[in-house]
Amino acid sequence: MRLPMNTSLATLKPSGIRRINALAAQHPGCIALALGEPDFPTPDVISAEVTAALDRGDTHYPPNNGRPALREALSAYMGDAGLTFSADEVILTDGATEALSATFMAMLNPGDEVIIPTPAFGLYESIVVANHAKAVFLDTEPAQFQIDEDALRACVTPATKAIVICTPNNPTGCILNAASLDAVARVAEQAGIYVVCDDVYNRLVYVDGYERFAQRHPELREQTVVIESFSKPWSMTGWRLGWLAAAAPVIAEIAKAHQYLVSSAVSFEMDAAARALTVDPTPMLKVYRARRERVLAALDAMGLDVVEPAGAFYTFPSIKKFGLTSEDFCIKAIKEANVALVPGNCFGTEGHIRLSYCVSDKDLDEGLSRLSNFVSTCLLYTSPSPRDYAASRMPSSA
């Protein structure tokens, strides 16, 4: 006899990215341009702090929200970027994923709605649905991956509780411009909804003039939750460390969810986290910038249209002219060219693929060469595909 489980979780699909990587693993020598994980080791000065912490026996329960000294350091770090949150308004989390989970667990009631501009990290939808709420998708492709205010307003209903924005964006690498941020602010203020800012890529920006939502609109701090991560800027994906910041009344409720989800982040990583805040990620950024230029040049030579990424380490070229779904394109690329990419349907946007350039230079060049050869063999678009693209949506992970 099979006993019933959570019906909300039953509707969720496994990560599409992980599935693509599993398929790639079945093909020896496959070059994976799929997973968003830096190829650099964590800087030694950060790792050394863990060794020191273990040597002195720092293996006991820490405060739920993180040690006061670390939260002070996080507050100061955010202050340097123009975001004003006190140490008491900061929680150290078990990665940005847990920060998102705790935020939505604290925020959502059954039947609430969360606006998710697409393309977007599939985890947002999964967490929203797991909390018995509804994801409402805002297609940003017609606006070159910016926020059209009229389209955003059309998504708002009496049930709307929040909007999630990610800038720089995963999977496009695009940055929301001032007009987009202002549109979100106006709608959020007028509708009385939260703005959840997934800012995990904010240190990986290639252009001047980048602004974060909380920096540009401090007047909405009571409605804003900021989420950051140690994973991307300092190559600490396996550490599972992140943090979130929000106004005191909001953080008090999120702290309850955080406590019951994970109790706390890892005690012997906290000094390392504080040390990371002092490490300049610019050397890694310079490498990513050079790789980005090579990728854009290669995509141009292949005749693939792409909105130039201004941050993160992804591109999101269009493959519409080939008349294939993004899923079919990526499966064929693995089987026929031994190169792995992520289908756009993982992010809620068909007709595109995500290409990650946080891999070694050797693998990147070989992967681009294989992709170029594969593209040259694809038939040009001849007629619309009869397949239901919406039905092929898959959640993404990392």
Please give the residue ranges for each predicted region.
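Helix C-cap/helix->beta junction micro-motif
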Residues: 27, 131, 190-191, 302, ...
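Conserved PLP-binding active-site segment of the aspartate aminotransferase-like
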Residues: 246-247, 316-323, 337-368, 372-374
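Active-site phosphate-binding strand-loop segment of PLP-dependent enzymes
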Residues: 140-214
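N-terminal small-domain helix-loop-helix segment of the aminotransferase-like
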Residues: 5-95, 102, 276-279, 283
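Conserved PLP-binding catalytic core of the aspartate aminotransferase-like
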Residues: 288-289, 302-336, 353, 361
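PLP-dependent aminotransferase class I/II
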Residues: 43, 223-311
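Conserved small/polar residues in nucleotide/adenosyl-binding loops
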Residues: 381-386
